[in-house]
Structure formats: C-alpha cells, structure tokens
Amino acid sequence: DILRGVVSVDSETLDDKILYKSDGMPTYHFANVVDDHHMKISHVIRGEEWLPSLPLHSMIYDSFGWLDKPDFVHLPLILKPIGKGKLSKRDGDKFGFPIYATSWSGTVKTKGYKEFGFLPQAVVNFLSLLGWNPGTEKEIFSLSELIQAFSFSGLNKSGARFDPEKNRWFNHSHIQNTKNSLVSDSIKKAFGSEHSKYKEEEL
C-alpha cells in the first residue's frame, strides 16, 4: 500500500469469500478485480475500511496470473464533526449540512450542495485537504492547481474531521474569486425563471 507500506496478514485469519452468488452473478470482490485488470487501472484509491480485503484481492490477481497489479492506496476515513466514528449520511441532518451533490429523493427529499449554492470546485478543494497536506500554507486551489500540487507523499494515515463551517468558508472564498459574470450565470441556472425579476447588476 502506497500510504501504509507493506501490509502483512496471517493466512490463518483469511476466510473463504463468496466470489459467485447462487444466481451466477459475481460478487464485488471478484468483479472489481477483473474489471480493474481489463480496464488497465493503474491505481486503486479507496477508504481504509477496504484494507482487510486487500489480501483477498491480491490473491485473486495471483490466481489469474496477473502480475501487473495496480498500486493500492487506502485513504483515512472522514470523521464526524463532533464525537467519534466516521462521517455518515445521518450526520448531515443532525448537524445541518448537505450530504449529496444534488437534491436526493429518498424517504425524505433533501437538498444537495448544488441547491445550497456550493460551487463544485469549492467542495472539491475542501475535500482534497481532508487527509492531505500540500506542504505549504496555501488552502485555496483551483482544480488545475490541485492536479499539479497533489502527491501521495502528502497523505496522512489518520482520519480528518469534517468541518461544515470550514466547508462554507471554502465556498465563500471561491465565490469571491469568481468573475461576477460567471456567478450570475450560476444563479440563472440554479433559479431558472425566478432570476428574471432581478436586474443583471443585482445578480
């Protein structure tokens, strides 16, 4: 694992996983390895809760004779704003922040980041710094800057706490750095015909 180094597991602790269901459908463990191989995936980047499955996935690669395994990176979990444990969908309702990218109609219809006025690049910027340090004091990044600055060496092994207020600050900062015309266009798309009651300079 690129982040955690060599991971050793006692083979006696490994159980026999089901690779095919009774209806003939492959399980995740089998399908994801086969798909990643044929898609020529170079890096598998996922949460640390999947680390215990790595030995099994590695053995599936070996059983097929596929020596060109992807590099694995198991990222630290995002933790609750308050209390112990990883962030869950229920925490959004509990602490008053959106969970989904856009509105979601489940048992209860909930608004997403888009409906709350969050810019996509602001949310990506905020999330990128949870568990990763660019090595500088710089916090506000454009997408292209993030691509240039990112490296696995900046990743942390410990979980990062989700801070809704910090998320709002990132969004505020990105809005301030966005041209007025682009902000106006975003408002028009978000509110549809509702924006027509306002003058362009008011937007």
Specify the residue positions occupied by each region the protein language model found:
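Active-site cores that bind ATP or allylic diphosphates and position pyrophosphate for catalysis
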Residues: 1-94, 98, 109, 134
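Catalytic adenosine-cofactor/nucleotide-binding cores of aminoacyl-tRNA synthetases and other
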Residues: 64-203
